[in-house]
């Protein structure tokens, strides 16, 4: 369930980010997991949520099969297509060498790309090739980058080619 109320905030993860900023000395975590279905904004070419799970809107979200009913259910973004994207308005990036890993499943080869920042500070990441996995979940090192300062960055994941199912990505920093 996700709130669609926007009276007291500008984007869905803003409340969570306020907690990260002001209630913890570890706002700049060494490792940070970002769930795909928890994006703030998205563009999906299909007209509805084909998985009919987790949130309203047309982002295709499904449950991972085989998760015991007494365990936390995991969701993932499915039925992706080239040209679709997911955006997180603010994610915390600590200073240091950052490795981004992606957990995905794909029946055919796919490609994604991360973009960071806004306006004149917007930076495209490399195109990441995701080999076919036979539909099995795998986590791969997508790329590394340098972050000079602690900061909150807009992050956009773009589907470049293929139809990967996307579970999460992690941001890990080595200082």
Identify what each model region corresponds to.
Residues 1-175:
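Extracytoplasmic
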């Amino acid at each position: 369930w996700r709130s669609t109320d926007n009276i007291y905030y500008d984007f869905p993860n803003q409340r969570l980010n306020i907690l990260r900023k002001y209630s913890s000395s570890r706002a700049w975590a060494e490792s940070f997991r970002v769930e795909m279905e928890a994006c703030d904004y998205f563009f999906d070419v299909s007209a509805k949520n084909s998985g009919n799970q987790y949130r309203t809107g047309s982002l295709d979200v499904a449950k991972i099969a085989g998760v015991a009913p007494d365990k936390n259910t995991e969701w993932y973004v499915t039925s992706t297509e080239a040209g679709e994207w997911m955006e997180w308005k603010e994610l915390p990036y600590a200073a240091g060498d950052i490795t981004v890993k992606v957990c995905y499943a794909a029946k055919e080869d796919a490609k994604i790309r991360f973009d960071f920042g806004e306006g004149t500070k917007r930076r495209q990441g490399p195109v990441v090739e995701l080999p076919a996995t036979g539909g099995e979940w795998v986590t791969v090192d997508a790329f590394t980058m340098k972050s000079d300062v602690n900061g909150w960055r807009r992050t956009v994941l773009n589907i470049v080619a293929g139809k990967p199912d996307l579970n999460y990505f992690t941001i890990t920093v080595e200082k």
